[in-house]
């Protein structure tokens, strides 16, 4: 499966992932809203939104 794997401040990149899922985490700090994408579906801290999916480049 192919997932995006970059933060919102970087140009889009992809990675082949064996985990079978992609994620998109979103949170806010002093820099504004931050978006991070990657492989798997990790647990997140309170205040961090996460959405996971299981198709190529889905998040």
UniProtKB/Swiss-Prot annotation:
Produces peripheral paralysis by blocking neuromuscular transmission at the postsynaptic site. Binds to and inhibits the endogenous nicotinic acetylcholine receptors (nAChR) in human rhabdomyosarcoma TE 671 cell line with an IC(50) of 48.2 mM. This neurotoxin is lethal to mice by intraperitoneal injection and to zebrafish by injection at the back of the dorsolateral region. Disulfide bonds join 3-22, 17-39, 41-52, 53-58. It is found in: Secreted. One of its GO terms (biological process) is modulation of receptor activity in another organism. Keywords: Acetylcholine receptor inhibiting toxin, Disulfide bond, Ion channel impairing toxin, Neurotoxin, Postsynaptic neurotoxin, Secreted, Toxin. CDD domains: TFP_snake_toxin. Expressed by the venom gland. Belongs to the three-finger toxin family. Short-chain subfamily. Type I alpha-neurotoxin sub-subfamily. GO terms for molecular function: acetylcholine receptor inhibitor activity; ion channel regulator activity; toxin activity. InterPro entries: Snake_3FTx, Snake_toxin-like_sf, Snake_toxin_con_site, Toxin_cobra-type. It comes from the Eukaryota. It comes from Micrurus surinamensis (Surinam coral snake). This is Three-finger toxin MS1. GO terms for cellular component: extracellular region. Gene3D superfamilies: CD59. PROSITE patterns: SNAKE_TOXIN (PS00272).
């Amino acid at each position: 499966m192919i997932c995006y794997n970059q933060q919102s401040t970087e140009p889009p990149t992809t990675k082949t992932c064996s985990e079978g899922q992609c994620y998109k985490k979103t949170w806010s700090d002093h820099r504004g809203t931050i978006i991070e994408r990657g492989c798997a579906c990790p647990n997140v801290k309170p205040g961090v939104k996460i959405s996971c999916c299981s198709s190529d480049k889905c998040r």
